[in-house]
Amino acid sequence: MNRNRINSCRIIHGDSRSILPNMTEKVDLIVTSPPYADARKKHYDSIHPDEFSDWLSSFHKAFYEILKPNGSIVINIKDKIVDGTRHRFVWKTIEKFCELGWYSIEDYIWHKTNPMPGYWPTRLRDGWEYCFHLAKSKSPYINQAAVKIPTGKWAEVRLANLTGKSAIRHNSENNSGFGRDLTKWVGKERVLPSNVLSLPLVGKNMGHPAVYPIGLPVFFIKLLCPEKGIVLDPFAGSGQTGIAALQLNRNVILVDNQRNYIEVMTKRIKEVAKNFSTQTLVDNFDIASYQINVVKKTP
């Protein structure tokens, strides 16, 4: 991929384990949502929960080698109820990645503001999914300022009811280990968000049964990928990560082993391209077929 291109997107059909080792460029960020364990078998290859950690970790080397030294990977993953209890494959998978050399930087929760209805005798509705942030180093690239949110009036309102030591509490005074000075929040226009991201499920059909909201990749791309950097989604599905990256002025590589999803994301990316002020994106849009090693350019 030519780094001088404006908002370039490359779509590749094939298995990331075979494709990524043959690519020369390094990426800044991997954002992806692997296939759900043992679900939606009619739509894509499904892995049994007992085999999931071994299966996903088989991509480890390809991911690790294509990522820059200060790069990150964000894995959106949902656990599964098996025989009435929650299977532990999610945590086994993350532990396995850490054993292979990755650092666990942060755990995020995608809070679904409109979870699917249903009834189960021993549990409630699933209203969240994991988003794990792993990195090759303990100090990956991060731009917290890019995701700060408005402070609002909560600091002033809270301080109005606090005085003296209630507003400024030091560790040495109560041995709580939680020192704080709420007065430091006064006057700040923007502050860091929490690690809980509240976003609705995607309601409309986008040619894929499990499309995460555009806000999810947008958040992580802003936070973990510099402008003009390269984002990779090795399980690209409907191309949602690609659309987010292009809108944020990043380059993107989308890989999927399902031909029908390649067609879906190609159509969606072309539609997004129409919204840009120039035709640069369309002109630079590549579709590569790894099996025949030919890059076909759209007109």
Region locations from a protein language model:
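Core catalytic lobe of class I
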Residues: 1-264, 272-274, 294-299
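Conserved phosphoryl-transfer catalytic core
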Residues: 270-298
